[in-house]
């Protein structure tokens, strides 16, 4: 038993070190969302007070998180966690980040720590969510993101944060759009939303792997409709910017276009930016030819557009 414990601990440490190797900026804190595991109905407790909610149910995955050579984290179950990054001088904004990965892993480097690197240099605090993989339990990723909001709202004043938005990429964009439309109260409602090449619909135009991994290979008509998030946009959906490429061969651009049309019908302010090229998965890298960076000379435009939009949201503070 003791040997098994040591082997398990070493595996977890190795996975953690692998993730750290891909981080451009070290988080100020890393917190497990369910410190006592998924089998206990508790989230994060501080000074005897429950700050977040319990896990709903276990997702059935066991063992340590896995990390591949690109820094993508998989097999996330008991070890779901959040990385918190607080800039030296916070400008009042914070973003909860949902990396993509088709609901089978989290792109923790290109769509996580690289986001934190860019944001903290602008004075924006960041919470990267390494959420549980559904594994047949479709409610769990959203519970994890909502718990991240609960934790960040609780500590916002001490961090100098007045506004908390959400950002997501690909399947993480589906999760961020879920957070933007399926929130349960003011605490879990994002103040703004950034969706980057997001999966939106689970109808014909969907990304097949994302849909199967969240709601299964033979989903009910109810689940398909419910998780097609163009159907969930309302007047209470936060203002949103969508950014993607016209030649995205993985996630049809109509996903974003249909979400934007739903926003227009409901009177939700927002912007839609479609770059000429770039494909899918270009993330937040600032290193030329790193990862799947296909934006080329449009990369500077992407950062300028997003930076301006975020600055404009901050003017309301």
Predicted regions and their residues:
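N-terminal cap/lid segment of alpha/beta-hydrolase-fold proteins
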Residues: 22-90
